[in-house]
Amino acid sequence: MKISRRTFTQNMAGSLLTFSLLKSLDKVDALANTVSPIVRKWLIEMEHLTQQLRQGQIKSTEWQSQIESLLSRVDLKDLLTAIDFDKLSKTAVFPEDHESAEDVDFSQNKGLPGELSFAPYFYAMKKGTAIVPHGHRNMASMHMMLKGRSHCWQFERVSDEAQYLTIRPTEDKELGVGAVTTVSDHRTNIHWFRALSEPVFMFNIGVFRINPSEAFNGRDCIDPLGGEKLKDGLIRARRIEIKEAYALYGKS
């Protein structure tokens, strides 16, 4: 069973306390009638790749590489038009200790199914706020910088314990406009972003519950800076709730 954007929004809202990121689809009117043929082709390719991922025809690491390649070929102006960037940027909300996210509706584009296999979002952040350190299970996602600068940290998820995750740092870099990052269960599972300018806008897609027979629970938040340093650069990081993650990492 494919989890819908609306179901994911409801689940996240319940499990992440006051995680007021995701708003109703009827508040965003970013429809496909403004999408150019190039971007429409890109959207169709993205949907095809995600269907292949869900059907087990490609691995999650292949999905990551191909999504990154697709985005590198899309003209930024076309992408901004496709998501109705002007409207979304004007109505964006900027919480004090985390990002905000608006749903982007591509469902009326020609050549696409009524319900996509991935969920697209528009993220907004004020300077100093963060997408707190977290990982996922049974999910893949992509973030693309649309405006501003952010710092990105990524980690491999080495092992799980009830109260800890052992992780290996893989990326520690600044991102500018056009930069793309991806995560999955099998490559760079954990990520963390901090806005270096204001505003920061990102395009995001999430592929939730890739394997319908396995659990999906949103975000696994951790405390990497307070973690135990192990040999070979590994960190044993404590699992934390979203409220504590916001307190520790949400604002700097």
What residues fall within each predicted segment?
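Glycine- and acidic-residue-biased ligand/ion/polar-headgroup-sensing regions
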Residues: M139-A140, M144-H151
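A short hydrophobic beta-strand segment most commonly corresponding to one strand
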Residues: M142-M144, S197-I210
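Asparagine-centered strand-capping/turn motif at beta-strand->loop junctions
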Residues: W192-A195
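C-terminal segment of N-terminal export signals and the immediately downstream linker at the start
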Residues: L22-T61
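A short glycine-rich, His/Asp/Glu-containing loop-to-beta-strand
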Residues: E99-K127
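N-terminal secretory signal peptides and thylakoid transit peptides that target proteins
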Residues: M1-L16
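Short acidic-glycine-tyrosine-enriched beta hairpin
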Residues: S159, Q163-T188
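Conserved short histidine dyad/triad with adjacent acidic residue
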Residues: Y121-H136, D185-T188
